[in-house]
Amino acid sequence: MTTMAETQTWQTVLGEEKQEPYFQEILDFVKKERKAGKIIYPPQKDIFNALKLTPYEAVKVVILGQDPYHGPNQAHGLAFSVRPGVPAPPSLQNIFKELHADLGVSIPSHGFLEKWAKQGVLLLNAALTVEAGKPQSHANIEWHRFTDKVIESLNDHPEGIVFLLWGSYAQKKSQLITNLRHRILKAPHPSPLSAARGFLGCRHFSKANQLLHEMGRGEIDWALDEKVS
């Protein structure tokens, strides 16, 4: 017997939203910016990587970011993750520190989080593009309208999801998560500016697995392999 989650996909829950004029306007804006010679991250093919790598029916955990990394070769469509061979930025270093303190897993030499995404961890930024060297430069082109819709669609997910909301921006999204089957864990942002105020020591990785276990869902293997393709 198939469950409702198995019959739902990102296409079925977001298909109508993608037909809205504002969504096409976002894509047109990004296309024009590239055509004008501006460098936009991530590359076009990677913009929707979070949704491609973590199918709707497979989502177990959601980690929300604000916007993509704005340095060369970093962003590839997964919040907090960087491409293989690129050093982990400071926030990700703190995520790894907490992961090590929480679960004892070794800190990897890379910051490529695709393994998490493929296990059901949706690594979603509120804005899906950014201009090189200009953080939050695309924060006002209505990406948030689309990504809020993503969160709302997950609120309707028939199985329990654990939302990890780090920092005040992500925590504002908790108002979109009203279904009591889901669980929300909050902590300060892992940025060096705030990590010591409670992100370090939050133990969200073990807590998320405990909640998934209680909900009858498979736990996440948070340890990252040393070799990545």
Swiss-Prot record:
UniProt keyword terms in alphabetical order: Cytoplasm, DNA damage, DNA repair, Hydrolase
Transmembrane segments: none
Annotated source species: Coxiella burnetii (strain CbuG_Q212) (Coxiella burnetii (strain Q212))
Reactions this protein catalyses: Hydrolyzes single-stranded DNA or mismatched double-stranded DNA and polynucleotides, releasing free uracil
GO biological process, one term: base-excision repair, AP site formation via deaminated base removal
Protein name (Swiss-Prot/TrEMBL): Uracil-DNA glycosylase
Location of the protein in the cell: Cytoplasm
Active site, per annotation: D67
InterPro entries registered for this protein in UniProt: UDG_fam1 (IPR002043), Ura-DNA_Glyclase_AS (IPR018085), Uracil-DNA_glycosylase-like (IPR005122), Uracil-DNA_glycosylase-like_sf (IPR036895)
UniProt xrefs under PANTHER family: URACIL-DNA GLYCOSYLASE (PTHR11264:SF0)
Keyword field contains Cell division: no
Gene name of the encoded protein: ung
